[in-house]
C-alpha cells in the first residue's frame, strides 16, 4: 500500500478528491528545476513559477486550467488540461481531461494513473 501525504486544503476550489492528483502532477512538473505556467482560460495566472504553494493557490480559480510544464532551460515539456468538478468524485484522475502527447507527458500521466487510476474515493 502506498501512503500519499498531501495538503488537504489546496487547490482551495478543487474537489477534495482531485487535490492529491493535482499536487502530485505539480511535483512532477517541478522536478529537475522545472517551472510551471498556468492559463486559466482568461490569462496566465502563473508564469514560469517554481513555487508549488504559489501554483496550487492559483489553480482552480476558474472551472478549468491548462498547466504548462517547462524544463530548466525554458523548453516546453508539455501541458495538462484540468477540468474541476467534472465527475471526479469517484475517479480522481478525471480532473486531467487532456494532455499534450509526448514521451514526457505520457510518462507523467502513467505514473499518476499508477497511483490514482481505478481508485474510488
Task: Name the predicted role of every residue range.
Residues 1-13, 90-121:
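Mixed-charge, Lys/Arg-enriched low-complexity segments
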Residues 19, 31, 77, 110-111, ...:
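Arginine residue identity/basic-tract feature
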Amino acid at each position: 500500500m502506498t501512503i500519499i501525504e498531501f495538503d488537504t486544503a489546496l487547490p482551495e476550489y478543487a474537489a477534495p478528491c482531485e487535490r492529491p492528483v493535482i499536487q502530485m502532477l505539480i511535483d512532477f512538473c517541478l522536478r529537475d528545476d522545472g517551472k510551471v505556467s498556468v492559463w486559466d482560460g482568461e490569462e496566465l495566472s502563473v508564469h514560469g513559477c517554481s513555487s508549488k504553494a504559489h501554483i496550487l493557490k492559483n489553480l482552480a480559480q476558474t472551472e478549468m486550467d491548462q498547466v504548462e510544464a517547462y524544463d530548466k532551460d525554458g523548453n516546453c515539456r508539455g501541458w495538462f488540461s484540468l477540468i474541476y468538478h467534472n465527475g471526479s468524485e469517484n475517479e480522481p484522475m478525471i480532473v486531467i481531461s487532456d494532455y499534450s502527447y509526448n514521451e514526457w507527458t505520457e510518462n507523467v500521466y502513467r505514473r499518476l494513473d499508477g497511483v490514482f487510476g481505478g481508485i474510488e474515493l
